[in-house]
Amino acid sequence: YLAERGVDPVMFNTYGSRRGNHEVMARGGFANIKLKNLLAEGKSGGWTRDFETGEITSIFDASQSYAAAGVPLVVLAGKMYGSGSSRDWAAKAPLLLGVRAVIAESFERIHRSNLVGMGILPLQFHEGENAETLGLDGTETFVIEPVDFGTGEPSMPNPREVNVSASKQDGETVKFHAIVRVDTPTEGAYMAHGGILQYVLRQLA
């Protein structure tokens, strides 16, 4: 992206130095070279399969394809999703890529909170369940039951569970309950408004 705009490679610098440029940071989402996406057929790094075309492509390019088709995205993850050096862009980039929910075995504490701040729904498998035990491989189409966070005031109790169904390409449907990891009434208010920024702006209006 930078090279196409005439930036010399020696001037690329780090993602941290480009954190004010959402175009760069969105492309940096899930770009760690050690990332292992089981949809990428063994390729490490920021790759995935674009089910609109069937091709293995960059996560950013696939996200643009899904956005054009009006398809919101779900991340299936394992334990302690979001672990590592805490960065706000770890939640901002998935939002820009079209991620609307993350279903994981567990979450790193700060990252879970940051997901809520971005309006991304964190869902947790029940103890003893995960993508493998449920037979999920990421090729499914997911339907998450609408979660009612009330009027958007930080006084309503949050729903504790939600029904999820995953339809496989062969027609089989896997249904399970997920724990809603929106842990406080204030977080519920953020989710009701679509994120913390929208919540704050509406409080000022």
Predicted regions and their residues:
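Fe-S-dependent hydro-lyases/dehydratases of central metabolism
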Residues: 1-205
